[in-house]
Amino acid sequence: MTTWYPLIVNPGSTQIQELPSGQDLNLTGSNISNVASITITSSSTALINGSGNTVGNIGSSTGYFNTLFATASKALYADIAENYLADSADYIPGTVLCFDGNAEVTQCNTDSCATVAGVVSSAPAYLMNSGLSGEHIVPVALLGRVPCRVQGTVKKGSMMVSAGNGCARAESSPTIGTVIGKAVESFDGNVGTIEIVVGRL
């Protein structure tokens, strides 16, 4: 059972009175503001999400933090992506895109395309260029594992190039600049989706 203690602020300062040993400080409410700083001196976990996974954010789309200093970080998702302006469609995850069209990227409709940009990410662990504005914005995976639409026979470890229809295909002797990534799993069918790894060729 959680024991709640009153929050006591020293008059004329930003200090918070120390709680009894072993007790947690719980801040709740829809708007907690004007906090100068919070100093953590304990070796235990400092900030805990008490409402369940995928609930709550640090910062917002309109209220940024500046720089995050940390020893390490972890994420559940598996790729690093960057936002790009797409032409006239909101492409589904796994679609192979190239640098062409009326915007920055478009669906790749050329086989073994040398202007290939990458694969639309489904859920990036880290998204760059998040402030990009436009009608059609797609996250393109730059590094890590990502689902990719493929066609034809693919063996695990195969180098993947564009197939000319928004999909990728295996290629044993790709030309420079055409490789999207390597297959993490095999596939034997017409069109489907498998995981590939991009950025480590």
What are the roles of these predicted feature ranges?
Residues 1-88, 173:
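Intrinsic low-complexity, repeat-rich intrinsically disordered segments enriched
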Residues 13, 66-201:
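Extracellular receptor-binding modules and their adjoining Ser/Thr/Gly/Asp/Asn-rich linkers
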